């Protein structure tokens, strides 16, 4: 017979301290999610050019196009699925999609397997990474969104960078396949197990925050949320276009940089180092820039970060020296650290809790569509004019996106604080 003690459920509260065990667990899980993507940062473009003999840059970057398109669509549906099925179930579904990926990369007999593996990786990343972001925001409440996002992205992209470094080192000793990809097998198994057995759903936290919102809102359809996030709300539009261009230049760097460095004559160990420095700097600084956006506001960090990214890309295109490329990678990491958590926090600020998960999924759709657009555009430009021209063109586009953000975005953190005080 149940007793009162057995029926008693733990109290639901918002905040990082109040939810630190689950928050810490989600940070660890996102590190494994990031590690799955890090497997590819150094290896896959070189597998295409060296093992499969691909000579077209556009064809080599096709794996990023498949990844970006599928991840963008997965992001788009992730918010809907999270609201309907619960965050935990969608997280587990993401890991299920990712389990075959390292095996496909190790055993791929031709390039079509690599493209298919990256489509599955896109599903996995779109669902699993989205859920770790959304669940942390659910747990943190409105006062610490920037810190929550910063810690999430820190864990994910630190794992991307360290895995890129590790796989580059292993590849220089053992070759491109299969030994460096064993890391991905471990990541997939551990991440799935943690998600199944230890994660708790956070919909009760959303209900608590929604109940304390300053004003009740009529339910919005997905189409209405899509329109608001894409173009109707000026802050959400500014964030969406900046996110798209941010990942556009990241997609370009993912596909073009290893080929660019290799063409100049760098070895796998040095290419791995350059590919690792950028996400490592990005990840570490997000611990600082996330909370700074809670204090200083989102807009200034986003605009300055986009312009710093543009400068770093231009420096890469104009130089032919490892030291300058290393400096440019550091600058690119700093700029991205300023932009990435601030954009997600800005979207959260401008979204009502009742449709925030869907708004974040729409933002992440546009942002990760940038991978596909960046890889395709950079590949076409590189085939026509060379690697340096492709990098410089994306630098110019990144600068223009910062201008659009400066003109369009209003400071979202001011609005968020006003809402907190009103409540």
Each model region followed by its residue ranges:
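Cytoplasmic helix-loop-helix junction between adjacent transmembrane helices
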Residues: 117-157, 345-346
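Symmetry-related core transmembrane helices of the 12-TM Major Facilitator Superfamily/SLC fold
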Residues: 179-197, 391-406
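Residue-level signature of mid-helix packing/kink "hotspots" within the transmembrane helices
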Residues: 68-76, 161, 279-287, 371-372
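Helix-loop junctions on the cytosolic side of multi-pass membrane transporters
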Residues: 195-210, 406-418
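Helix-loop boundary and gating motifs at the non-cytosolic
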Residues: 17-68, 235-238, 242, 246-264
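Structural signature of the two symmetry-related core transmembrane helices
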Residues: 89-103, 300-315
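Juxtamembrane intracellular "pre-TM" segments in multi-pass secondary transporters
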Residues: 2-20, 201-239, 421-423
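Helix-to-loop junctions at the C-terminal end of transmembrane segments
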Residues: 74-86, 171, 285-297, 382
């Amino acid at each position: 017979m149940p007793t009162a003690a057995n029926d008693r459920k733990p109290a639901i509260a918002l905040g990082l301290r109040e939810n630190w065990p689950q928050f810490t667990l989600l940070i660890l899980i996102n590190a494994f999610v990031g590690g799955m993507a890090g497997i590819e940062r150094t290896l896959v473009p070189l597998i295409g050019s060296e093992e499969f003999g691909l000579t077209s840059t556009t064809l080599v970057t096709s794996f990023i196009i498949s990844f970006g398109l599928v991840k963008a669509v997965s992001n788009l549906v992730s918010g809907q699925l999270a609201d309907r099925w619960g965050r935990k179930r969608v997280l587990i579904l993401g890991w299920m999609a990712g389990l075959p990926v390292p095996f496909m990369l190790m055993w791929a007999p031709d390039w079509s397997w690599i493209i298919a593996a990256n489509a599955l990786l896109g599903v996995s990343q779109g669902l699993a990474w989205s859920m770790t972001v959304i669940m942390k925001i659910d747990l943190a409440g409105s006062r610490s969104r920037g810190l929550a996002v910063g810690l999430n992205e820190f864990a994910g992209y630190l794992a991307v960078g360290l895995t890129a470094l590790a796989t580059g080192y292993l590849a220089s000793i053992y070759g491109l396949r299969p030994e460096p990809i064993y890391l991905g097998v471990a990541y997939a198994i551990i991440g799935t197990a943690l998600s199944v057995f230890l994660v708790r759903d956070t919909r009760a936290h959303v209900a608590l925050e929604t109940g304390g919102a300053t004003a009740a809102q009529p339910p919005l359809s997905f189409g209405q949320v899509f329109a608001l996030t894409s173009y109707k709300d000026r802050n959400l539009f500014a964030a969406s276009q900046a996110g798209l261009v941010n990942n556009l230049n990241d997609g370009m760097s993912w596909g073009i940089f290893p080929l660019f460095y290799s063409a100049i004559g760098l070895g796998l160990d040095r290419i791995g180092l350059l590919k690792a420095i950028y996400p490592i700097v990005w990840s570490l600084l997000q611990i600082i820039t996330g909370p700074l956006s809670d204090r200083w506001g989102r807009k200034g960090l986003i605009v300055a970060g986009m312009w710093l990214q543009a400068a770093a890309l231009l420096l890469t295109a104009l130089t032919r020296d490892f030291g300058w490329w290393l400096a440019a990678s550091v600058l690119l990491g700093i700029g991205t650290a300023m932009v990435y958590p601030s954009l997600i926090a800005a979207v959260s600020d401008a979204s009502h809790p009742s449709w925030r998960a869907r708004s974040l999924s729409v933002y992440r759709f546009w942002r990760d569509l940038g991978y596909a657009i960046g890889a395709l555009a950079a590949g076409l430009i590189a085939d026509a004019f060379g690697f340096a021209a492709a990098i410089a063109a994306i630098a110019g586009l990144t600068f223009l996106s910062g201008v659009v953000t400066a003109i369009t975005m209003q400071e979202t953190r001011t609005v968020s604080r006003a809402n907190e005080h009103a409540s």
